[in-house]
Amino acid sequence: MSFEQVVGEKENRLEFLTSTPPMLPRQVVTLAFLSKHLPSALMSAQLAASLCAESSGVSVVLVRLQPSERPPSFLDAYDEGRATAVDWAPSEVMLQGQFGMPSSLIRTETGFHLLTLNVHGETSSPENIASLVAQLRRQFRYVLVEALADETPTPGLLEFLVQSDLAYLFLQGTTEDVYHVDLLIRKLRPRCQKPSGCFKPILCLAEGEQANGFDLLIQRVATPVHMYVRQCPTAAAGKDPGAPGGLTSLFKADLRRLAREISGRLLGLALSSGAAKGFSHIGVIQVLEENGIEVDVVTGASIGAYIGSVWAYGHDGREMERLAREMEGRWRLWSVIDPVFPPRQGFLRGLALKRRLMRSIGTSRFADLQRPLRVVAGNLVTLERTVFASGEVATAVHASIAVPGICVPVTIDGETYIDGGVVDPVPVDILREMGVSRIIAVNAIPTPDRIRYSLQAEQELARAKAGRGDRARRLFRKVVPLEQQLNYFARGNLFEIVMRSVHGAQVRLAEASCGLADVALRPDICDDRWLDCRNPGRFIALGRDVAERHLEEIKALVARKEPNHEREHTPRPMAAVA
């Protein structure tokens, strides 16, 4: 399309062009590929197709930016005989001086539209890019912009990122790519008023490839890795997606998760602290699995982090119950007790519990987990909340379960951490910050009213038993209170006082966090015996019960449709999209 054609129809489109496009959530998303070894065209097309599948009936356009010196085919290595409509899209919109929407767009078999733009060096001004984005906003609910990032980010790429509501920065685990993402974010910060969380690094790992510490490096120099794309094919392998082993189910699932984030369909699960009461999380997970409800992201604090890590690793609810029941019995608790002497920072190291966790998940890192996980801990020095999303999972969970005054604080990379339940007992807001729009929160921390009810019931039961039983045994326990003198875990002793004090600080925080969730599950736990690990089945049953009672509400949340913001397309030839 020529510049003269654009000018010729300018008057006819004046009202259309000057109207303000609706600002919809996550409407314009830039897919910036920082590595030339990634199959950018394949990944963006797969993501666009997944977005169409997740948002049926909603219009999606993939805008493919290519330097003007390239031939029309974006995938250079495709043979002309095997190329599809996606590969040989007409490049009739030129990014120079003025924009004109093409008279027709290619609609792919998977439902999205494809528009290829030739980019002429430095001629793509901010005004022109803003004009294009405004036109696309009017016509499509979702606009995906695919761009290859050079070693030095071009002004055009930076402007597309500034105009975007969200940007995924795809990179590989190399020092060069880490440098590129750091440079890109540093150049964006002065120009963009959006929060830095809008620019999300996506680490792409080939089949069998490990993060090898690059997740930690990215977090230090830029921002934490948002998500991972695993079993990612190379650029060469991506030329033939139909080849055996070309696209794995895990690769598709990871891209589908990104599409669910864009479409506002991500489902998150926030698991609270609560010590032994946290076994109720397992019952909730079992009900979700039995009803085919797929959770995309998990966050947890303290025991919630422990259980969330086991589930994110790949163990299902039944296997988790089996692992929990290994703690049944009067003396099983001592298998995770590792005293410290002298108890200068705490009475327990917490390493025994960490070793028990590693029996289930090994030395896995966050990049190895089947679903994204966020672990919460408190920084003892700065008193701020820390969210672990990279590194070794067991180490992060060890920090999250270090109850202050009982367990020795955990030091990681020179920083000292304590129990995550102290700073964020039900980490719902972390899910919101990640872009999760549908959240289920499980709060296993009993409220004061429930605790009072439990105490009254115990008193009534004690009075009923007062006239019967072994009077000699009761008299002996009263005269020689060995339980109170020797058992530091007994009610009214040191550990109990510390835990109840922590619990008192958590109650209001937990309830406030539940108010941010779409569905809040509160198992009917009345007693406050934080170390009652001898009967995990009881808490699991309570978790199942509350999940089953709210099952219809959960299903309605999963099936909830986002508001339809589609506009009726104008019949004008320059603005209409076929």
Regions found by a protein language model. Name each.
Residues 204-207, 211-250, 317-356, 360, ...:
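Non-catalytic peripheral regions of patatin-like phospholipases
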Residues 1-37, 244-266:
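Extreme N-terminal, non-catalytic leader segments
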